[in-house]
A protein has these predicted regions:
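Left-handed beta-helix
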Residues: 84, 89-90, 94-103, 108-109, ...
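Terminal amphipathic alpha-helical/low-complexity segments used for targeting or macromolecular assembly
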Residues: 1-78, 185-191
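Detector for the N-terminal beta1/A-loop initiation region of ABC nucleotide-binding domains
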Residues: 81
């Protein structure tokens, strides 16, 4: 809601896209329209849209439509559709293309999307998924309906999650998704 929170969120998320690259490499990526640059531009527009949505008066009147238009335009090019307010800070989009997130979905910190993902309702109800912290969605993974996922869950590639998983630190996969194994953490990262 505040400018400081916006800056902190952007600083945190930018690390994934630009952390160890030299200025020369960053310039080359920008000139050749590298997918990482485009995804970062989209993510930045998403966060500014969220910021201006929470403002009042002239700031909201001018800033919100401007950044929402930019987010939508970049989203059309990249195949990403997300509404403001769905993701807590720490979102990482590894690959663009066919990513759809329902505006009512709520995803906690440090979610990773690997492409071709859907987080949405089931078509029978307007209720959308609620995902905990540190969710890693593999390529093609879908989370559908009024479901809740605990923290530290890895969703395997191609999985369709249509029920809740409330035990943290597990790996799920399959159609419909089921528990594959208990998660193993090593130095704070899943193996």
């Amino acid at each position: 809601d505040t400018k400081q929170k916006l800056k902190e969120c952007l600083r945190r998320e930018k690390k994934f896209y630009r952390s160890s690259k030299s200025l020369h490499d960053q310039c080359v990526e920008w000139v050749v329209k590298d997918p990482c640059v485009r995804i970062w531009q989209y993510q930045k527009a998403l966060r500014y849209t969220e910021y201006y949505y929470c403002q009042k008066g002239l700031k909201k009147l001018i800033g919100y439509p401007l950044f929402r238009h930019r987010r939508n335009r970049l989203g059309l090019k990249l195949g990403i559709e997300m509404m403001e307010g769905s993701f807590a800070p720490g979102l990482i989009i590894h690959h663009a293309g066919n990513i759809v997130v329902n505006g009512w979905a709520r995803i906690d910190e440090d979610c990773q999307l690997h492409g071709d993902n859907c987080i949405g309702n089931d078509g029978k109800s307007l209720k959308a998924p609620r995902l905990g912290k540190h969710i890693d969605m593999g390529v093609g993974a879908k989370v559908i309906g009024d479901v809740e996922l605990a923290d530290d869950i890895v969703i395997g590639a191609g999985a369709v999650v249509n029920r809740s998983f409330l035990m943290p630190g597990i790996t799920i996969g399959g159609i419909p998704a089921h528990e594959l194994k208990k998660g193993e953490l090593h130095e704070g990262k899943r193996m």
